[in-house]
Amino acid sequence: MEDGVELLKLAKDRRAIVWVAQEYRYMPPVAEMIRMAHAGEVGRIHQVAIREHREPFYPKVGDWNRFSANTGGTLVEKCCHYFNLMDLILGQRPTKIYASGGQRVNHLDERYAGQTPDILDSAFVVVDYPDGARAMLDLCMYAENSVDNEHITVIGDEGKLESLLPALTLRLGKRADWGKREVWGQASGTGRGVAVRRVWDTNIRYAGQHFGASYIEHQRFAAALRSGGPAEIGLEEGLRSVATGIAAHRSIASGQAVWMADVLPEGL
């Protein structure tokens, strides 16, 4: 947190923009999901759930990503973009974090300068927001053989949006389309009236990383530089997502809920 606060101070009087690379909001089905959610397609939003079931961390220079002292921990280094996505979808700042997680499978047989890696490989994180809405992250990094590694769900009082990657699929299910329950016990998972489509942005000339999101973000960054416009993702927003990850790690260590006010400096 100290480094992030120092960056805020350094950037305060700069004329040049500082843009934090939170690219997940630009992935085509996710971008469309956010647009639809903010347009009221599912009514008032009450829950956001993000599941990532994937492969372990890749090897990196100096094996720096094997130790929490270098990265801030998996929920900071790997997952801050998910927490940023939650804030963006709900349009609020988080208030309280509950988390449970650990290192169950990955890297336990590795040694670096005689030290065993300590980064967690699985966790559940629940994030509370001021109006009572909640978000949840389900992370598992020893789940390679999945059809879709990333599943983002936005649920409102009128329906549900789902984004699936790498399938690039977006689903919209409206409660009204399901119809009136005639018999208690009648299955609600029939998919009746659920709209399903594959979403791609034809503006993406090179898919690169994150299903073209990095391409789109670089385009927007370049446009902001040329026009003198503001960064779409500023340092304060980035710092809040890091703080959520730090709070989650503190919650895991203590077994207690952690208030964001105890992590973020006053005014952020």
Model features per residue range: what roles?
Residues 80, 138-147:
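Glycine-rich phosphate/pyrophosphate-binding beta-alpha loops
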Residues 7, 33, 247:
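Aromatic/hydrophobic pocket-lining residues that form π-stacking "cages" and hydrophobic walls in ligand
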Residues 109-116, 124, 128-129, 152-153, ...:
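C-terminal glycine/acidic-rich active-site capping loop/insertion
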Residues 4, 27-30, 82-83, 218-219, ...:
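A general structural signal for well-ordered alpha-helical segments in protein cores
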Residues 16-19, 24-117, 123-124, 255:
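Predominantly a Rossmann-like dinucleotide-binding segment in NAD(P)-dependent oxidoreductases
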Residues 1-17:
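Rossmann-fold NAD(P)-binding glycine/threonine-rich loop
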Residues 18-20, 137, 163:
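Hydrophobic residues in well-ordered beta-strands that form the structural core
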